[in-house]
Design a protein with these regions (language model features):
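Cross-family detector of peptidyl-prolyl cis-trans isomerase
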Residues: 1-84
């Protein structure tokens, strides 16, 4: 499992709970980042994943963008491709 400072490579799609998709890496290059530099909900959720796993993360606003856009609870489909 990745740790809190691991660099992860993922594909993801993000939605607001009204079904509005606001971002996606699917169909393009995978997204890479350190888990301590993304929203807290990703830091928590992706640490529970194993390589190759796909998971849906329901992230409350206080673990997402905290009033910034997009606001409210967010839903991310995440595929963990690799980590180190």
């Amino acid at each position: 499992h990745p740790g809190p400072t691991s660099r992860v490579t993922v594909h993801y799609t993000g939605w607001q709970t009204d079904g509005n998709m606001f971002d996606s890496s699917v169909g393009g290059l995978p997204f890479q980042a350190r888990l301590n530099r993304v929203i807290a909900g990703w830091t928590e959720g992706v640490q529970l994943m194993v390589t190759g796993e796909k998971r849906r993360l329901w992230i409350p606003e206080d673990l997402a963008y905290r009033g910034g856009d997009p606001s409210g609870m967010l839903v991310f489909d995440v595929e963990l491709i690799a980590f180190n």
